[in-house]
Amino acid sequence: MSQAETTKLPYKVKDISLADYGRKEIELAENEMPGLMALRSKYGAEKPLKGARIAGCLHMTIQTAVLIETLVELGAEVTWSSCNIFSTQDHAAAAIAAAGIPVYAWKGMTEEEFDWCIEQTLDFPSGEKLNMILDDGGDLTAMVHDRFPELLDNIYGISEETTAGVHRLEVLNKSGKLRVPSINVNDSATKSKFDNLYGCRESLADGVKRATDVMLAGKVAVVCGYGDVGKGCAHSLKSYGCRVLVTEIDPINALQAAMEGFEVTTMEEACKEGRLYVTTTGNKDIILGEHMKQMPNDAILCNIGHFDTEIDIAWAEQQVADGKATVSEIKPSDIGAVDRFTFNDTGRSIIILAKGRLVNLGCATGHPSFVMSSSFTNQVLAQMELYQNRDNDKYGVQVYLLPKELDEEVARLHLEAIGVKLTKLTQEQADYIGVPVEGPYKPNHYRY
């Protein structure tokens, strides 16, 4: 696949020789991503994204490769970087580079390399700049607003994948600094109620087990936060036989957790008995040094929120620098990043996974392809919606949700693949409840 007449395009990946391996896995993933493949079939001929120059900053995985090639199939030019220093699958990046698409990503980047990679995506092989942003976590959006504001007048839209990035968009919007129409993909029902919940339900345990080979059954696990991600994590660990404790600030979420049978307590109490800790909040300072010092020997700490601010890794590293602890690298970052910190005064150790970054991507391969198809179909539709309305006033400078009918369409595209047969309303039934026969069926405020 080539996206321009020039066949040799710049890229930076770890090992281009992995391209064949990556291509085989991409072909397998396509069979598990019916939403994206349906968009290719439906829109491939008309090229609705022709002229779009999409800079993407999202985990460079096999599933993302299918997203990238869908955008190209629909007419876009694409450049890509990863939104996390540990999340790239190097064979996926190699396959995309070999396909002639500029990609700048490898597993185990430094923070400086991470910023450099994002910056490379602003320029396209034609010599032109980006005119669309597809973001996950808001780093690309922030870079353009903070460092390259001169580019903003020519950017038609931003689509944002995750909770943390949406929060950053909302902060920009409320402060009057947002300058580009934006779509919050995260809060589409077919993203947050599937990726965040069912994706984490499978990929959390995958990351923990690949990193540690630990048996989960019988252990006390602490899940910090009971939003969609926390729900998926708590139910996953419960299904493995863990006794799950939940910490939560929101009384509604706390009540939900309690009604599901989880013990809801504070970190000050939970830190004394948990053998596994999972942060899911997207906030900062969830697990502090004072908590780590009280944990049982070889307690495992990991994070599945977007940023590395939830576990106070800096405190643990400072303990080592001050001679109060030692650290042993069990696995290097290119195969999972597992570090064991031992405190001199107690002799007890804690094990930190992926250096406090996303454990499911740092220590494993992230969510399964099928659930990512749902998320990424939303992304493609958001890019199409923004780009195709670039010359009218449908979208002003604020943060929008995808229209409900598109949210429902994403779900429809995935039903046949798993054998779902949908009941159809009669006109009389539709009239009775006041909805169209073909939907949308729920108001925007419906929570699912």
From Swiss-Prot:
Binding-site residues for NAD(+), renumbered to this chain: 162-164, 196, 225-230, 248, 283, 304-306, 360
CDD domains: SAHH (cd00401)
UniProt cross-references to Gene3D superfamilies, sorted A to Z: Adenosylhomocysteinase-like, NAD(P)-binding Rossmann-like Domain
Entry-linked InterPro entries: Adenosylhomocyst_ase-like_sf, Adenosylhomocysteinase-like, Ado_hCys_hydrolase_NAD-bd, NAD(P)-bd_dom_sf, S-Ado-L-homoCys_hydrolase_CS
Molecular function GO labels: adenosylhomocysteinase activity
Pfam families referenced in this protein's UniProt entry, alphabetically: AdoHcyase, AdoHcyase_NAD
Chief location of this protein within or outside the cell: cytoplasm
Binding note for cofactor: Binds 1 NAD(+) per subunit.
One Gene Ontology biological process: one-carbon metabolic process
Pathway annotation: Amino-acid biosynthesis; L-homocysteine biosynthesis; L-homocysteine from S-adenosyl-L-homocysteine: step 1/1
Free-text function comment from the UniProt entry: May play a key role in the regulation of the intracellular concentration of adenosylhomocysteine.
PANTHER family, per the entry: ADENOSYLHOMOCYSTEINASE
Protein name: Adenosylhomocysteinase
